Design a protein with these regions (language model features):
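Proline/glycine-enriched tight loop/beta-turn segments at coil->beta junctions
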Residues: 1-5
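Serine-dependent carboxylesterase/thioesterase catalytic core
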Residues: 6-12, 16-17, 26-27, 32-131
């Protein structure tokens, strides 16, 4: 069995269940130990969540090499976490459907007071920075 792990990080409005098929595939067909990092997408702040993701990754890294797979907002959080403390991890990162340069849709929606609560602070602060 591989001493390599994959941490799956879900996107906005998700909880990690949507990545379970990918996790099963990585476990069954490639021998990875798969863990899911779940976080609140509509409250809290990205800096705290990235800190928690770094701690989670460090706890998994004790067992060997760690890779990250982030979907959408999860990819933004993976990117930020690895940018700030990536030297601690010796694996790879894959982001799926991740708006690393911001999102014009999120930026537009953030301008509407009725839609702001649906976006949460992570989207308003991380994704709505459309470039």
């Amino acid at each position: 069995m591989s001493r390599e792990s994959v941490i799956l990080v879900h996107g906005l409005w998700m909880n990690g269940v949507e990545l379970s098929v990918l996790g099963q595939h990585l476990r069954r067909d490639h021998g990875f130990a798969v863990r899911t990092f779940s976080y609140p997408t509509l409250h809290g702040n990205a800096a705290e969540i990235c800190g928690e993701l770094a701690k989670f990754g460090a706890s998994v890294a004790d067992a060997g090499r760690v890779h990250f797979v982030g979907h959408s907002l999860g990819g933004v959080l993976v990117h930020r976490t690895l940018s700030e403390c990536g030297r601690e991890f010796n694996g790879n990162a894959v982001v799926l459907g991740t708006p690393l340069n911001g999102s014009k849709a999120a930026s537009g929606a953030a301008r509407w007071p009725m839609l702001r609560p649906l976006l949460g602070p992570h989207v308003r602060n991380e994704l709505a920075v459309a470039k």
